[in-house]
Structure formats: C-alpha cells, structure tokens
C-alpha cells in the first residue's frame, strides 16, 4: 500500500479501460491522397508510452479517459495516443537512453572504476541516485511520473519494442526499499501494480519484478513529460 500518492489518481478510474493490445494497423500513412498510401509502423507492437502520457494529460485536465473497453484502430483517440507515443520517445535522442540502459556491457552495480569516476555508473546507481529523486519529486508535487522500463539486455535496436512505459503515482519508502505504485497500460483497471527497488543494493543485484505480472525490470528512468490537451469526446 502506497503511503504517498498523487491525490485523486487511481488507475481504475484515471487510466484507460482498454489494454495496450491494439490491432495490427499502421500508426501512420504517408503518400499522395488517391494515388498511393504507404503504411508506417504497427500499432500491435504496443502504444504504452502514448497511453501513459495521455492518461496524465486527462488527469491534469481534470477529466477521465473515454470509457471504451476496446482499443481503437482509427479516429481521434487513436491518433492522439500515437502522437503521445512519439512524444514519449523524445525524438531524436530519446531512444538512445533505452539503448544505453539495454546494453549488456553496462554493469548492474558499481565497479572499482565507476566508483572513482573512470567508468559509467551501473544501473542500480542510476536508478537510486539519478532517477528515483526525480520520480519522487513528481509524485510529491502531485504529478504522476512517466517511467521507461528496461526489460531486455540487448544491443539490437529492434529489441526496443521489448521495453515498456508506465506511470508512477505513489510510493512507499521503508528503510532503503522503495515500492512504487503504477498505472500499467498492459493491466487496465488494476490498482495493485507495483515496482520495487532496494536503494541499498551495491555488491550484488538481480532484476526487480513488477507485481503481479512478475515481468523482470533491469532498469528504469523518468521520462521527460510535456503536456498536451486531450481530444474532446464530442
């Protein structure tokens, strides 16, 4: 149970009712109307970042997302979620953040060289020292905090789609262990998704897990959020 929460944010009411399980349709089409239309992207790969950003948009505009239980395949809401997905990647440099943290060469914990500044800090140091304070500041100031979750170690850019995005809206800090409460687009209407990290981990560390899914998370970081006005339902 989170002891500090964003007032009024509850995933079952503040998140989308449908899951991050979109049909196999292109994200965009480019071309000449009536002559050629080329499909770009595939919604079935997931739009979690767009859903996380959009959920915060609706919340901060004092409204709830549409009550639809089926993911859209076209129309204003679909286009809006796709636009927010693009925003969540902070192009052109945003994907490099994922690739850096996915790289198997990056250590999980500190090494002799990283402790003296001669090598990059490991994943645990970055989560605890760099990312967690920013996430906590968001929540303490009443804002859900978008997180990028690293769920694969790989140098293959095509594995970017294996990662995930969520919204942290609460936390419990006990000793050196923090447990964050999350809105997970993969688990609509669930108020019980959490992610934990032992901030004291140093010598050894294993991937933390999201509950109740049990999915491994090798690292996380706060995603820079920019606000947009959600579409009208009219």
Where would I find each of the regions flagged by the language model?
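Cysteine-nucleophile protease catalytic domains, especially the papain-like/related folds used
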Residues: 11-129
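Structured loops at beta-to-helix junctions and adjacent beta-edge loops in soluble globular domains
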Residues: 21, 51, 150, 183-185
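Short loop/turn segments at secondary-structure transitions that flank enzyme active sites
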Residues: 24, 54-59, 153, 172-175, ...
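Sequence-level detector for tyrosine residue identity
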Residues: 58, 80, 98, 169-171, ...
